[in-house]
C-alpha cells in the first residue's frame, strides 16, 4: 500500500526496522501502551461491514490486555464503538487512559487555537 511504502522508505532512511504483525496477541505482547481506533471512520460508513469482517478478532478486550506488559495502558482517540474495537470493561477499566487522552487533546487544541488567534 502507499502508506506502507512511505513508512518503509522512512524506516530505511533512519536505519530502523518495521514489523507487520497480523496476530493481535503477538502485537500487544509486552506492550506498554495499546492504542485502538474505530474500524470505520466518518465518511467510511459504507465500508462498515467489510471492515468488521477484516478486523474481526482485533477487539481490545480483557483477554487481549492480559498479553500486554504489566501496567500497560490503553488509548483510543474517541469516539469509540464499545463492543466493536474495544470492550466496555477495558474502555472504562483501571488501565484506560482514554478520557485523560481526550482531555489533554482538548487543552492542546485550545492552546493551538489561542496561538493562531494571536495569543488571545
Residue ranges of predicted features:
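Short, well-ordered alpha-helix to beta-strand connector turns
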Residues: 8, 30-31, 94
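Rossmann-like adenosine-cofactor binding region
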Residues: 13-88
Amino acid at each position: 500500500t502507499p502508506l506502507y511504502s512511505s513508512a518503509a522508505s522512512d524506516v530505511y532512511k533512519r536505519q530502523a526496522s518495521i514489523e507487520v504483525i497480523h496476530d493481535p496477541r503477538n502485537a500487544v505482547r509486552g506492550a506498554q501502551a495499546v492504542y485502538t481506533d474505530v474500524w470505520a471512520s466518518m465518511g467510511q460508513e459504507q465500508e462498515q461491514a467489510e471492515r468488521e469482517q477484516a478486523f474481526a478478532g482485533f477487539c481490545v478486550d480483557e483477554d487481549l490486555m492480559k498479553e500486554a506488559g504489566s501496567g500497560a495502558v490503553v488509548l483510543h482517540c474517541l469516539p469509540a464503538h464499545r463492543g466493536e474495537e474495544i470492550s466496555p470493561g477495558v474502555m472504562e477499566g483501571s488501565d484506560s487512559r482514554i478520557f485523560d487522552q481526550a482531555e489533554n487533546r482538548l487543552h492542546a487544541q485550545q492552546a493551538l487555537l489561542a496561538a493562531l488567534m494571536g495569543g488571545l
